[in-house]
Amino acid sequence: MNIHEHQAKAVLAEFGVAVPRGYPAFSVDEAVQAAEKLGGPVFVVKSQIHAGGRGKGRFEGLGPDAKGGVRVVKSVDEVKANAEEMLGRVLVTHQTGAAGKQVNRLYIEEGAQIAKEFYLSLLVDRETSWVSVVASTEGGMDIEEVAHATPEKIVTFSIDPATGVFPHHGRHLAKALGLTGGLAKEAATLLNQLYAAFLAKDMSMLEINPLIVTGDDHLRVLDAKVSFDSNALFRHADVVALRDESEEDPKEIEASKYDLSYIALDGEIGCMVNGAGLAMATMDIIKLYGAEPANFLDVGGGASKEKVTAAFKIITADPNVKGILVNIFGGIMRCDIIAEGVVAAVKEVGLKVPLVVRLEGTNVDLGKKIINESGLNVIAANDLSDGAEKIVKAVRGAA
């Protein structure tokens, strides 16, 4: 689960992390009130969306010379004018895709004197189950660009959760960022604070870009991005309260109600599969045959008829879907349950695109019988390769 920048900073502040003063604003009036509280002389008006690249983004409906989603201004009147221009508009960045995201809230923050910029992040290393710390002197840039152009400027080290942060970790971070004296001590303190927040809130990623040295020689978090482990939300009611569903895909929200693992993609072939590994293999083979998957959807091993019906409805709700491939290898998941769910969903919502079904495993004969006797126009597949080839051919033929 992702949250907005202003929420991330509020969470970090609970652990003593130094962040600039600021206030969220959901209207122009609230933006003006926030600026008046801050007092100036410099304000930063920040669009709040769940995507990076806001500063370099562009607003739909504004000219090519218009400013991006993060603007530095020097008066309350300028805060008001920019808030009027930004709120309600769609901001397009390199992470949002062409559709962009509508800006429904702003963050009005005090300006800061920037002497240096750094990059710092914490994330889970899934190979070791340790917490990886990634640091770079190249702050304010996309870390992917830094990794590609100057990988030697990125330093990574890991922290064992069994022992936590030791003094040498703080020294390692300070050295990586070229900090000495008081700033080196602040870096060590900051690492302890961030690590404490990371563990206490079950974060999966904590990214600070940039971490700055201010004009008066102190470290301060200028931007923060936080993602939480969705599997741990049951023990964090305070984190769940921060969720902004307007930033999420409605289909993904619906899928979460049925405990379905669903991720929307940009392709044209919808997929319904049991098992994450098989789902990824299914997407790969669709691409192998020259098409693109419209989603990742894992119904899991113990899906009910109702769950399968919901999954099928979610797939068909995507207007980009031109065909559907159901690929089930029945182990715990019975093929007859899948068949009943597909038949029920098609009878309820109709079938306007080609449907290819590949069933194998537990109760496969019963599953095939249910589909064959349903009267539905379903294309049967013998195996995964056959299924992918048939759905791609059917979609291309219908185009």
UniProtKB/Swiss-Prot annotation:
Biological processes per GO annotation: succinyl-CoA metabolic process; tricarboxylic acid cycle
Q: Where is ATP bound in this sequence? A: 46, 53-55, 109, 112, 117
Task: Give me the comment on cofactor binding.
Answer: Binds 1 Mg(2+) ion per subunit.
List positions binding substrate.
Answer: 274, 331-333
What does the entry list as the binding residues for Mg(2+)?
A: 209, 223
Give cofactor(s), names only. Answer: Mg(2+)
InterPro entries cross-referenced by the UniProt entry:
ATP-grasp, ATP-grasp_succ-CoA_synth-type, ATP_grasp_subdomain_1, Succ-CoA_synthase_bsu_CS, SUCC_ACL_C, Succ_CoA_ligase-like_bsu, Succinyl-CoA_synth-like
A GO CC term assigned to this protein in UniProt: cytosol
The ATP-grasp domain is annotated at 9-254
Spell out the molecular function terms from Gene Ontology.
ATP binding; magnesium ion binding; succinate-CoA ligase (ADP-forming) activity; succinate-CoA ligase (GDP-forming) activity
Gene3D superfamilies assigned to the protein according to its UniProt record, in alphabetical order: ATP-grasp fold, A domain, ATP-grasp fold, B domain, Succinyl-CoA synthetase domains
Pathway assignment reads: Carbohydrate metabolism; tricarboxylic acid cycle; succinate from succinyl-CoA (ligase route): step 1/1
Q: Which UniProt keywords apply?
A: ATP-binding, Ligase, Magnesium, Metal-binding, Nucleotide-binding, Tricarboxylic acid cycle
This entry's Enzyme Commission designation comes to: 6.2.1.5
Q: So what does this thing catalyse?
A: succinate + ATP + CoA = succinyl-CoA + ADP + phosphate; GTP + succinate + CoA = succinyl-CoA + GDP + phosphate
Which residues pair up as cystines?
A: none
Q: Which domain of life is it from?
A: Bacteria
* Complexes and interactors: Heterotetramer of two alpha and two beta subunits.
| Biological role | Succinyl-CoA synthetase functions in the citric acid cycle (TCA), coupling the hydrolysis of succinyl-CoA to the synthesis of either ATP or GTP and thus represents the only step of substrate-level phosphorylation in the TCA. The beta subunit provides nucleotide specificity of the enzyme and binds the substrate succinate, while the binding sites for coenzyme A and phosphate are found in the alpha subunit.
Similarity-based family: Belongs to the succinate/malate CoA ligase beta subunit family.
UniProt name for this protein: Succinate--CoA ligase [ADP-forming] subunit beta
Please name the source species: Phenylobacterium zucineum (strain HLK1)
